[in-house]
Amino acid sequence: MAAPRDAEIHKDVQNYYGNVLKTSADLQTNACVTPAKGVPEYIRKSLQNVHEEVISRYYGCGLVVPEHLENCRILDLGSGSGRDCYVLSQLVGQKGHITGIDMTKVQVEVAKAYLEYHTEKFGFQTPNVTFLHGQIEMLAEAGIQKESYDIVISNCVINLVPDKQKVLREVYQVLKYGGELYFSDVYASLEVSEDIKSHKVLWGECLGGALYWKDLAVIAKKIGFCPPRLVTANIITVGNKELERVLGDCRFVSATFRLFKLPKTEPAGRCQVVYNGGIMGHEKELIFDANFTFKEGEAVEVDEETAAILRNSRFAHDFLFTPVEASLLAPQTKVIIRDPFKLAEESDKMKPRCAPEGTGGCCGKRKSC
């Protein structure tokens, strides 16, 4: 049973996203505005096929679209009006499946209302999308089976939940081994104060419940995930003086991370990997995270954990693997857990620069996430 404070937060969030907000124009901060740039062509085409009401009622940050999705089973946490679900529906194809879950009934009803429309629009024989009304901290209660998904995504939603660890534990349970949680969310530069947490507007707009970014790695390790791998990061500017006074020195960043669930096997050691190319939208270059970019046909030395992720995930057939003897190549140390605020600052210095294709997050330094 949810604690009284948790239950109150759930009620406030449902009211905010179900009744207060009618379109994205009603947001009082810029923390969850969808960016207009940085979207690759194949995703842009898929987005153009989504009904305009579904898009207008969607409040996520950026586009959360990982790579290599053909035939995958994907779960979208906090699917809202279903925008991302309908984009992904086209990318996984008729043999894949998308499940969206959201605790705001009004949003789920919007998503369901256009199920037949999108099935026909995409040229599918039967729908490959299912929408569920439920809480993302209680996936089993919603009927979601253990080890049944290749990928779980979330778009600016986990911050709205009081118990982040409970959400990530549920995600770990429903992922197959080799699967990943690929998600965009808002993170704080320090522990968020009680004044910020208790502010209903700041919570509803993705700031009040933001996790201190270093805590993500602690929670992930406790549950069993590999260390978080940062993909993109962009500074959030609020643009509301009254709310900025409440926030004080606390800064916020939107960041896309990927967390992998790997089988408990002995590490195989460092490897040289060669990307075979051919992944849709990433035929010549795969930007895997902030540390590793793989170009078609080019050998890259990777640490044992990165090698294990590539070997055990849906990317296994996209790479050639060659073991590296310690005596032949000196280890190249990379900091796996990157600071999203530093990456955002580095990215800002390199303007003009957009988020890597298909990776989610936002484009450049914006008044949004």
Curated annotation (Swiss-Prot):
List the subcellular locations.
Cytoplasm, Cytosol
Gene Ontology cellular component annotations, sorted alphabetically:
cytosol
- Which Pfam families does the record associate with it? Methyltransf_31
- Main location class: cytoplasm
Listed GO molecular functions?
arsenite methyltransferase activity; protein methyltransferase activity; S-adenosylmethionine-dependent methyltransferase activity
Briefly state the protein's biological role: Catalyzes the transfer of a methyl group from AdoMet to trivalent arsenicals producing methylated and dimethylated arsenicals. It methylates arsenite to form methylarsonate, Me-AsO(3)H(2), which is reduced by methylarsonate reductase to methylarsonite, Me-As(OH)2. Methylarsonite is also a substrate and it is converted into the much less toxic compound dimethylarsinate (cacodylate), Me(2)As(O)-OH.
Protein name from the UniProt record: Arsenite methyltransferase
- Its gene? As3mt
